[in-house]
């Protein structure tokens, strides 16, 4: 899509999602008291406390989230995706999350910067009425792929399919994304509840 851009040579890419899968998540946002969930402003304020500025831009169904250091003004990472209407309702598709390679040496890198970027995306999906989120953790390196899968499991995603290229059913995945990996889904409301203590204001 037109929104996809490469940061610079010193970057690392986290996920790519599969756009053609049907959400199997049944929990709906309206069953949860919205006051118990972290708001977008609370996520933004929590990021500022870590010296990170997050910016959300939207264009039709597409969105882009950029993370910038408040200390250096350098871009630390970026996420892109879209809101898609599917048979089961609206679904949040995370096209990619990219982090600068230099951030990997920071304690707050994947489980910090990546988590903040992901939280903005998930909250945005919730506000747009999405019930679930989908992605594909690309397997272009066994070591890095295992880190990706652990990261997504830690924040609340579940494995639904391994795209290995060994079956005809994997062909569509590989044609769209150009590689193999692990398909993962998550319930958006459950993600926000899981992250509640990290982002929700005490009062």
Question: Which sequence ranges carry the predicted segments?
Answer:
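Non-catalytic substrate-recognition and accessory regions of acyl/acetyltransferase enzymes
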Residues: 2-112, 116-138, 145-165, 169-203
């Amino acid at each position: 899509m037109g929104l996809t851009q490469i940061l610079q040579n010193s970057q690392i890419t986290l996920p790519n999602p599969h756009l053609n899968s049907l959400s199997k998540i049944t929990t709906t946002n309206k069953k949860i008291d919205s006051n118990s969930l972290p708001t977008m402003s609370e996520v933004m304020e929590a990021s500022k406390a870590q010296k990170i500025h997050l910016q959300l831009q939207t264009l039709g169904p597409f969105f882009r989230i950029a993370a910038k250091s408040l200390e250096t003004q350098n871009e630390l990472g970026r996420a892109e995706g879209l809101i898609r209407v599917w048979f089961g309702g609206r679904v949040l598709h995370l096209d990619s999350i990219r982090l600068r390679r230099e951030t990997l040496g920071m304690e707050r890198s994947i489980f910090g910067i990546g988590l903040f970027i992901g939280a903005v995306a998930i909250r945005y999906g919730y506000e747009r009425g999405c019930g679930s989120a989908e992605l594909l953790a690309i397997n272009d390196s066994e070591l890095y792929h295992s880190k990706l899968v652990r990261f997504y499991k830690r924040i609340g995603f579940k494995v639904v399919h391994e795209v290995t290229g060994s079956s005809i059913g994997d062909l569509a995945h590989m044609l769209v994304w150009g590689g193999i990996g692990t398909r993962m889904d998550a319930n958006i409301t459950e993600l926000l509840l899981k992250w509640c203590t990290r982002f929700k204001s005490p009062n």
